[in-house]
Amino acid sequence: MRLSRLLIGASLGVALSSTVFTAALADVKFGSLYPISGSLALLGEESARGLELAVDEVNAAGGIKGEKVVLERGDAVDNNQATGEARRLISLVGVKAIFGTYSSARVIAASQVSELAGIPYFEMGAVADEVTGRGLQYLFRTNPTAENMAKDSVDMLIKGIAPGLGKDPKDMKIGIIYEDSSYGTSVAGHQEDNAKAAGLTVVLKSGYPSNTVDMSSLVLELREKGADVVMQTSYQNDSVLFLQQANEAGYKPLAIIGGGGGYSMQPTADAVGHDLIDGVFDADYTQYAVNTSATPGLTEFVEAYKAKYGSQPRSGHSLTNYVGAKAIFQALNAGEGFEPDQIVSAVKALDIPDGQAAAGYGVKFGKNNQNERATMMGMQWQDGKLVTVYPENAAIAKMRFKK
């Protein structure tokens, strides 16, 4: 009798341990690689939240192919750490893919590690040309690019801002300033090309380190060149610094057009003051004050964000990462498995039409594994809020101009 009890107990123990082992096998691990400390932490963390919300949503619906998605975080505080964290996630954690990363410089560094290891890397926020311009087999980008941002900046000037000011855009003088990493350099280069192709006059194109603590000489140079339109591609600190020092110097261009980054963040408006930022334009990812008929699912995303994090989203970076991650998860669920080539095949077959995602655009990967359907929008700060003013089908407000 005692022996039979022991045998039953042993059998039960084996069954239980087998169940636990099977449950462990039912998890699929992905890396979440963003700058979550250091100077880019605010936007990095905001971006990571979008991925986390997409994971919550897919797990609530049964996971991917019946397997629960588990995220392992990595901190891409600088380029060296981004590389080291990519190695750790791949070699020690055993992730099936990496998602990230917001910073162009960080993803350019980290994706070289994943490419050599044959592990897919999904970039959902960095815009620089070089991200997808290196011909990597395992890197895919879901978000719009520096070229999209630059084109929208110039188009918005020609089609909306100049007419609203009663000006011929060819009579306006443009100053282009930018933080000098891959992000700012790419956007500024395309802005100059687009402006010149449209017959516009660029009087200054000047870069600076994003950690600069004084932009007064650049403000002076813009004024001396007679720039009445300033296009700035920047992170938060340098966005705040430029707006404050331009104001202190009494430099008031007819229009300022931000290139995402700090110009899309509510904390930037709060830091400089709503009166100072009022009227400033911005070309960037889809934001939240937008015509929701063009962005199905956006309202539900905002509600999920508030429920998880206890506040409104701080910028459109979370939304862009959420949309990208959801698209990849959809592809993987329709795919054959989680081996690298299976993931690549599944993602290449993805075909989401325009107007079916919360950011308003679709997803289909084309040349260099870039999402060829990704687009940006034009916004303006009005009464302390960033509202969509361009294109017309997504706008909820008309452009305002100071008399």
Swiss-Prot record:
Keyword S-adenosyl-L-methionine carried by entry: no
Pfam families with a match to the protein in the record: Peripla_BP_6
Sequence intervals crossing the membrane: none
Alphabetized UniProt keyword annotations: Amino-acid transport, Signal, Transport
Taxonomic superkingdom: Bacteria
InterPro entries tied to this protein: BCAA_transport, Leu-bd, Leu_Ile_Val-bd, Peripla_BP_I
One Gene Ontology biological process: amino acid transport
SUPFAM superfamilies from the UniProt entry: Periplasmic binding protein-like I (SSF53822)
Signal peptide interval: 1-26
Role noted for this protein: Component of an amino-acid transport system.
Family to which the UniProt record says this protein belongs: Belongs to the leucine-binding protein family.
Protein name, entry field: Leu/Ile/Val-binding protein homolog 8
